Swiss-Prot record:
Keyword Amino-acid biosynthesis: no
Coiled-coil residue spans: none
UniProt-recorded name of the protein: Ferredoxin-2
Location relative to the cell: Plastid, Chloroplast
Source species of the chain: Dunaliella salina (Green alga)
Role: Ferredoxins are iron-sulfur proteins that transfer electrons in a wide variety of metabolic reactions.
UniProt keyword Plastid, yes or no: yes
GO molecular function, one term: 2 iron, 2 sulfur cluster binding
Length: 95
């Protein structure tokens, strides 16, 4: 499993995320309450920003190349591919 540090408005939380689990699902299993809506990678409710490390969000269909290039991630369809740090609650920063 990878260690994923989530920087939330209520503080930093580090959780373990298996390579085949979506980050949002793992966060919920750890008792964290993160924003989401569609859970299908087709909206921006769950958006976060990768501060360090790498993720795979090839299942997402909402973010354009520029947004992905700036580090934005849809946590509902993102897998960790290394230990990483992600700022959550970033939907407003997208626009």
């Amino acid at each position: 499993a990878y260690k994923v540090t989530l920087k939330t408005p209520s503080g930093d939380q580090t959780i373990e995320v298996s390579p085949d689990a979506y980050i949002l699902d793992a966060a919920e299993e750890a008792g964290l309450d993160l924003p989401y809506s569609c859970r299908a990678g087709a909206c921006s409710s769950c958006a976060g920003k990768v501060e360090a490390g790498t993720i795979d969000q090839s299942d997402q269909s909402f973010l354009d190349d520029d947004q992905q290039g700036r580090g934005f991630v849809l946590t509902c369809v993102a897998y960790a591919t290394s230990d990483c740090t992600i700022s959550t609650h970033q939907e407003e920063s997208l626009y």
